[in-house]
Amino acid sequence: TNPNAIVGLTEFMADTKLSRKIELDFGHLFGKWEKQTELIVFNPPWLPASYDPEGNDEAIYYNENLFPDFFEGAKKRLLPEGKLVILFSNLAQITNVTKDHPIEKELTEGGRFQLEKCLKKTVKAASEKTKRDPHWRSSEEVELWVLINI
């Protein structure tokens, strides 16, 4: 519900060929899109919220319904054998915010998708100038999940 991503992408695409092939919509999860597709890419917030996030906090924290709502909506909108590509992180687990991993939970309990692959990349060390405590940074991994509609 923050339009900055749409504004930024619109400016980035400008008058490129992409701008003629991609239609953007500002809305919750799938917005106005109902038509089935072969690919859905999702870059959700990486930390569960302990309160109801608003504004810029929605880019960092997700509420308890985000992932169940997303997976339910994705199932309806993916063609048979269509793919979900999800960018995520183990940040919530290594900082002990939660033990639950929403993508792993969906694969275990949801019965809607099958894992094709999960690629992980270690995050670079934080700058020595940072004031945040980066002791967990060496354990952080960014994850790229590819799930297939079953």
Question: What is each residue range found by the language model?
Answer:
Residues 68, 81-89:
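Conserved beta-strand signature within the Rossmann-like core of class I S-adenosyl-L-methionine
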Residues 10-11, 52-55, 97-99:
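Short amphipathic alpha-helical segments
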Residues 46-47, 89-94:
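Short "lid" loop at the C-terminus of a central beta-strand within the Rossmann-like core
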Residues 3-5, 44-69:
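Mobile active-site "lid"/loop adjacent to the S-adenosyl-L-methionine
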Residues 70-74:
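Class I S-adenosylmethionine-dependent transferase superfamily signal
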Residues 94-150:
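Class I S-adenosyl-L-methionine
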Residues 18, 78-80:
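Helix-to-beta-strand junctions that scaffold the AdoMet/dcAdoMet cofactor pocket
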Residues 1-42, 48-49:
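Conserved SAM/SAH cofactor-binding pocket of Class I
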